[in-house]
Each structure stands twice: as C-alpha cells, then as structure tokens.
C-alpha cells in the first residue's frame, strides 16, 4: 500500500483541527435535544461495530434546527461513466473448500446459505475461480503437465473434482444464477521458459518451493514461451477448461489471461509483458468468442496505466478486451484508466487480503478500498478468500484474511469483520444498481440507486464517539446515529416496499 506523504506543518494543522472539531462535536451533541424516532417502514438502518456486528438501529426525524453532519444525494447524478453494478462475490479457492469441509454438513450448508442465497445474507452473485492452481490451492498443479502435449490429449480437470467443483456446486445450490469468471496463476510448466510453476524463492519463514536460481523470473519479462505454437495451444487450453466445466453444469462467462502478470512469486505465477499479452490475445480472443465468453485485461496489480494502454494500442488485441480487472497497487491507475477507456467495464478483481489476523483496523482500510473503487467506476467487487482455517495460512506459508474462519479441531466457524463490511454493501445493493455522487459534510459515504427505485447509503464513522448525520435523498430526509468507529447502511425504499433486512 502506498503511503501519503505529509509535511510536519500539514500534520500539525490537520491534527489540531480534528481535535478542535471533535471536541466541538461532542459539546454540541450534548446540548442538542434528543432526536425523535421516526417509524417509517421505507427506512432501514443497520450498523456494525467491532463488538456488535449487524445491528438494526433506529432512524430519527429531521426535526431539529441543525445537525453536525449532512449527506445529500441526487439520484440523477451518477458517477461519471460508471456502469450498472454487475455483481459481488469472492474467489473459489481449494483451501476454502477444505476448511469448510471440516464443518458438519449442517454448518457448511448454513455458511453457504448466508453467503449465496439471494434472499438472505451477503447474496453473492458473481465470483472468481482459478484455472489450475493458485496460492490457496492444496498443491501446485495444472490441467496438463505432459511435456509437449500440444494436442492436449492429457488435459483433465480431475484434480478439481475434490475441491473446486463441489465448492461451486454448493454455492449454486443456493444461487442458481451464479456468474463466474476465471484466470490462471500459471500455465502448465512446459509452456514456460523456466519450466516451473513459480518464479521466486520462498520468503524467509515460508515453505521452500524448490526453485533453482536459473528458474527465477522477473517483472517486465515474458516467462511464457513466445511462439505461435505455444500461444495456440494455451488458447485451446482455456477453451478446454471452459468446455470441461460446462460439462459439469458450471458456466464460466469471462476470463482474464493472467493473474498479476507483473509479479514473480514463490507460488504459482507467470510474468508477462503487455506486448506478450497482446500477442496471446490474438489467439485467446477467437477461442473465447466461439464459446461466447468475454475477455478482460488483467489482473492489473501495478499503478501504471501504460500497461493497459500498450495492449489497447494493438487493435487486434483490443477488439477482444471488454473490461479490466484491477487489484492491489493497480488501484492507483484506476482513475486514469476510467478516464481514458470509459467503454471498459471495471472490476475490483481481488480485495487486498491482510495478514490472517482479521482485525477490525484492517476492515477500516478495506472500507477505504471499497470507496475508492466505486468512486472510480467499478461495477464488480470480489473478495479474495471466502474461507480459510484459523490463521489463514496458505500452502506456501502466507497468512491472509478471509470472510469465514474455521477451527478445524473444534469444527466451528465464525464470520470475520470483513464479511460484515461486505454484507453492508451486497445485502442491499442489487445487480444493475448505479453508483451515485454524494455531497455534504459527511464525505465518508457511498450511495447507490437500485433498479427498483430504492436508494442505498453506506456510511463510515472513524471517530471514537457517535455522530449524527442528516440524510436527504430524493425528497426524503432522516437522521441516523452512527456509533463510534462503525460502518452502517441506510436503505430508503419507495412507497409500499417490503422490509429491507432479509436476514
């Protein structure tokens, strides 16, 4: 994460201002008359703090003369060139399924219902999956490790039948309309110049992956063999993957050619140059078009928009690119990408994954990520690990956060803070929703207009004391009370709408 640099004068001025404002806010609130509750079924308000997640809270009448913060939303003012929302979800990783498999069948079904049922909790409807192994696979593998098998006679997804396929089927049981997109972390080893699944040595304290010094890769080089025969075979490899999963009743509707193509990692990875990716798209594009599968550029994990610009300058490659997947430091390129390529759909393709502690402070950081992506035009948002064992340790020794943590010994589970943050979005914001601009003194907010006319406001209070916010949306006004250090959602429905909180 890149840090903002402050001068000492800026820091002192800002700190003093915040302290004075905070003291004034507390004094003013103590002198205000208590707000009067408003019993209007059109309003639903839910709050989450570190200690008390997902609490239905009171909405108040805007009857006093003034409030400390205000938030105004005009449903006609959308974020410029933002596409309607396409979906939310996480990534189907092997360790996600092996952790959930430690639970009883009843508990596992309860988790999947909470995550995927369209009328219940998070309502996930669009998820990611790997093509072969990723860093949360049980081991390194691809669908064809037979050296020189250009006809893909030995292609097989049998490895996935124990993990990914049942994981996805379990989700589809609750969400039959689930959409999927996929990307590889590495091609088969024999298609790479180093003939190995990884490109870096293990970091200190992590599991040795056995890579030799001459096999180490570097950013800015094509590790994939840049020859037509290999491009053609790899494109057909993608096609065989699509076909094999369709035979299992699982339809993948979009692919990206490479996860984090700039990063040489100690786990499955493959570096590409943008020029190399453009060449590959000449082959991948037609294979996917024949199957009615979209192609996005990505995933982009560097804050350099020229990486995308280079591909889009190749007209043949650009003709196949419908969107872009952005993650990690790629977020720094997002505003420029959105300005330069307004026709491209933008997904936040992998939320930054933390360190396995799943603490509340990191959830606050994830809120800032969410705010940045949606204000920059994203129409899809994907978390990374749906579930892990306690500690979130990967096969290659990296601990990461997850929505659900499983204690394998006790056979119990818990929903982590990040889950509730994401639920504040996905429980209320529907497919087809538009991201709206906001204005007022309450800037820590996001706003959406659903296709059914309902409005959804997400608000964050970072202060150590509660705050009152007066909200004005489409002629409707209300006051909400944000608990100290909290995230909240206010849903405003039209006349004769049903209750907003489903579960």
Model regions: which residues?
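N-terminal secretory signal peptides and thylakoid transit peptides that target proteins
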Residues: 1-19
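N-terminal catalytic cores of secreted or lumenal carbohydrate-active enzymes
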Residues: 55-250
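Active-site neighborhood of glycoside hydrolase catalytic domains
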Residues: 236-240, 244-254, 261-351
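Aromatic/acidic polysaccharide-binding cleft in carbohydrate-active enzymes
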Residues: 348-420
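Glycan-recognition and catalytic regions of carbohydrate-active enzymes
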Residues: 406-453
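Carbohydrate-binding surface patches
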Residues: 427, 438-474, 485
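C-terminal beta-strand-rich structural cap/linker in extracellular carbohydrate-active enzymes
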Residues: 483-503
């Amino acid at each position: 994460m890149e840090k903002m640099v402050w001068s000492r004068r800026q820091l002192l001025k800002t700190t003093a201002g915040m302290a004075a404002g905070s003291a004034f806010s507390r004094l003013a609130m103590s002198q205000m008359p208590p707000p009067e509750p408003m019993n209007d079924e059109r309003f639903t308000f839910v709050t989450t703090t570190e200690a008390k997640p997902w609490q239905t809270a009171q909405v108040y009448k805007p009857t006093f003369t003034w409030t400390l913060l205000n938030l105004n939303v005009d449903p006609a003012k959308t974020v410029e060139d933002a596409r309607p929302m396409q979906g939310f979800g996480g990534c189907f990783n092997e360790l996600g399924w092996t952790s959930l498999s430690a639970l009883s069948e009843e508990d596992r079904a309860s988790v999947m219902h909470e995550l995927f049922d369209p009328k219940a909790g998070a309502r996930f409807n669009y998820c990611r999956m790997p093509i072969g192994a990723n860093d949360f696979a049980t081991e390194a593998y691809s669908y064809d490790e037979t050296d020189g098998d250009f006809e893909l006679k030995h292609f097989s997804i049998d490895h996935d039948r124990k993990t990914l396929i049942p994981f996805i089927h379990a989700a589809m049981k609750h969400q039959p309309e689930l959409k999927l997109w996929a990307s590889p972390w590495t091609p088969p080893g024999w298609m790479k110049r180093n003939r190995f699944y990884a490109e870096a040595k293990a970091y200190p304290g992590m599991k040795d992956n056995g890579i030799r010094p001459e096999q180490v890769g570097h950013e800015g080089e094509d590790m994939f063999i840049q020859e037509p025969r290999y491009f053609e075979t790899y494109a057909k490899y993608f096609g065989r993957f699509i076909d094999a999963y369709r035979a299992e009743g699982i339809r993948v509707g979009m692919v990206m050619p490479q996860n984090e193509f700039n990063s040489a990692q100690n786990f499955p990875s493959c570096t590409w140059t943008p020029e190399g990716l453009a060449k590959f798209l000449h082959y991948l594009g037609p294979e996917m078009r024949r199957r009615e599968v979209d192609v996005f550029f990505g995933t982009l994990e560097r804050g350099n928009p020229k990486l995308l610009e280079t591909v889009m300058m190749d007209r043949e490659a650009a003709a196949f690119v419908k969107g872009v997947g952005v993650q990690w430091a790629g977020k720094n390129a997002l505003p420029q990408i959105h300005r330069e390529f307004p026709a491209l759909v933008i997904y936040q393709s992998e939320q930054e994954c933390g360190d396995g502690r799943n603490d509340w402070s990191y959830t606050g950081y994830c809120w800032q990520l969410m705010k940045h992506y949606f204000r920059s035009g994203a129409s899809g948002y994907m978390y990374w690990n749906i579930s892990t064992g306690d500690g979130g340790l990967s096969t290659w020794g990296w601990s990461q956060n997850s929505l659900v943590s499983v204690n394998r010994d006790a056979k119990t589970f818990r929903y982590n803070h990040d889950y509730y943050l994401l639920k504040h979005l996905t429980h209320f914001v529907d497919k087809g929703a538009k991201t709206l601009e906001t204005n007022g003194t309450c800037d820590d907010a996001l706003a959406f207009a659903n296709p059914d006319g309902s409005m959804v406001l997400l608000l964050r209070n970072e202060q150590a004391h509660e705050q009152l916010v007066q909200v004005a949306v489409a002629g409707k006004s209300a006051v909400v009370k944000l608990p100290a250090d909290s995230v909240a959602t206010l849903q405003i429905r039209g006349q004769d709408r049903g209750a907003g909180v489903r579960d």
